């Protein structure tokens, strides 16, 4: 996993004025969201390392791309070097994870942003990404460092309650629930994930919940279970361009299947924000990235993140290219032009990166205020 717009069925007797009014309302919402985001901090405030000025990476003379057949690994450029995570909140969350036997993708996937996310960072939005259903995946994607097995241990029936209890005590603003793939289970673990969402919301309805979920092998009943669980953001990563998908992802993961999952999630629950992520540096071309972004927009995806692929161990795919911050900025601008609610694009950006969660929180809070105002006007 880590990392198709079907038309809604309508009846001909529905008056055109209803559709027109709905379209107008959606346009107003979109404009208001854009305005709100414009007033907030720029995305570069989150991803730019203050110790690395523009001139430093512009003048970098190291090699950024491996040639075909070349075996030697590329040297890590300066803009990808991060500090060791520290801080009270970081230590608190890590300790409680151990106590409750919970896994986080932040640790399992060796995310470079763990200290900033768990600690709250400059903008104070504390986030964490919990990995449900254990630390062992039934798939073997060539970019991912999570353990794999054909038949992982059984699910922990106490995990939904333990997870919700921990999250409620942390005082987080935004939580991301992700999971390993569990192809060994009839429902892929979808009911387990949905139960966890409901437990979290029962304890604190103000926490925004994002679920970064598997494709469930295209099983739409599983997609519907998650979409209607009470979550706020439905995320499923396309990971790479179509041409590289068979080479990068597990053979059971398919590019078009991912697009269908994202499309159907929105159909099952039109109020959801949908989100996906693309890794760069695996040998893709600009034309292929452009095509992937357009496919995601056609699938109705609201938010997209683009980040640098980093080889987790010597056993995984080597980095073909280190993409410059300037190029990531280009894709951020291109994503905005294509109509995504936000495009998070930077070398250290990951699908669960806290800056993206800050922006999505703004969107969700805005929606909640509009909904409350509408309810008050009816009274």
Swiss-Prot record:
Keywords: 4Fe-4S, Iron, Iron-sulfur, Metal-binding, Mitochondrion, S-adenosyl-L-methionine, Transferase. It catalyses: [[Fe-S] cluster scaffold protein carrying a second [4Fe-4S](2+) cluster] + N(6)-octanoyl-L-lysyl-[protein] + 2 oxidized [2Fe-2S]-[ferredoxin] + 2 S-adenosyl-L-methionine + 4 H(+) = [[Fe-S] cluster scaffold protein] + N(6)-[(R)-dihydrolipoyl]-L-lysyl-[protein] + 4 Fe(3+) + 2 hydrogen sulfide + 2 5'-deoxyadenosine + 2 L-methionine + 2 reduced [2Fe-2S]-[ferredoxin]. The keyword Zinc-finger does not apply. The keyword Transmembrane helix does not apply. NCBIfam families: lipA, PRK05481.1, PRK12928.1. GO terms for cellular component: mitochondrion. Disulfide bonds: none annotated. Belongs to the radical SAM superfamily. Lipoyl synthase family. This protein may be expected to contain an N-terminal transit peptide but none has been predicted. Coiled coil: none annotated. One of its GO terms (molecular function) is lipoate synthase activity. [4Fe-4S] cluster 1 binds at residues 106, 111, 117, 352. This is Lipoyl synthase 2, mitochondrial. Pfam families: LIAS_N, Radical_SAM. It is found in: Mitochondrion. It is an enzyme of class 2 (transferase). Its cofactor is [4Fe-4S] cluster. Binds 2 [4Fe-4S] clusters per subunit. One cluster is coordinated with 3 cysteines and an exchangeable S-adenosyl-L-methionine. [4Fe-4S] cluster 2 binds at residues 137, 141, 144. PANTHER family: LIPOYL SYNTHASE (PTHR10949), LIPOYL SYNTHASE, MITOCHONDRIAL (PTHR10949:SF0).
């Amino acid at each position: 996993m880590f990392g198709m717009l079907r038309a809604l069925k309508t009846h001909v007797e529905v008056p055109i004025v209803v559709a027109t009014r709905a379209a107008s309302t959606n346009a107003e919402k979109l404009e208001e969201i854009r305005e709100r985001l414009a007033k907030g901090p720029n995305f570069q405030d989150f991803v730019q390392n203050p110790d690395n000025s523009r001139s430093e990476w512009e003048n970098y003379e190291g090699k950024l791309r491996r040639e075909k057949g070349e075996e030697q690994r590329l040297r890590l450029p300066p803009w990808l070097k991060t500090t060791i995570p520290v801080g009270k909140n970081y230590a608190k969350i890590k300790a409680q994870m151990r106590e409750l036997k919970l896994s986080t993708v932040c640790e399992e996937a060796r995310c470079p942003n763990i200290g900033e996310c768990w600690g709250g960072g400059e903008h104070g939005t504390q986030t964490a990404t919990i990995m449900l259903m254990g630390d062992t995946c039934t798939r073997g994607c060539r970019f991912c460092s999570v353990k794999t097995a054909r038949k992982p241990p059984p699910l922990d029936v106490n995990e939904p309650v333990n997870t919700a209890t921990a999250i409620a005590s942390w005082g987080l603003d935004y939580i991301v629930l992700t999971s390993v793939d569990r192809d060994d289970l009839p429902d892929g673990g979808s009911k387990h994930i949905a139960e966890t969402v409901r437990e979290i919301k029962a304890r604190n309805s103000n926490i925004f919940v994002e679920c970064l979920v598997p494709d469930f092998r295209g099983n739409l009943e599983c997609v519907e279970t998650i979409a209607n669980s009470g979550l706020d953001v439905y995320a499923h990563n396309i990971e790479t361009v179509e041409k590289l998908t068979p080479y990068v992802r597990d053979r059971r993961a398919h590019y078009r299947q991912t697009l269908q999952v994202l499309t159907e999630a929105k159909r099952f629950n039109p109020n959801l924000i949908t989100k996906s992520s693309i890794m760069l540096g695996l040998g893709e071309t600009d034309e292929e990235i452009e095509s992937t972004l357009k496919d995601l927009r056609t699938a109705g995806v609201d938010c997209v993140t683009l980040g640098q692929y980093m080889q987790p161990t010597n056993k995984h795919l080597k980095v073909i290219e280190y993409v410059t911050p300037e190029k990531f900025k280009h894709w951020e601008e291109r994503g905005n032009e294509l109509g995504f609610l936000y495009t998070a694009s930077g070398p250290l950006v990951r699908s669960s990166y806290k800056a993206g969660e800050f922006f999505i929180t703004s969107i969700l809070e805005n929606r909640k205020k509009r909904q409350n105002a509408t309810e008050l006007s009816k009274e």
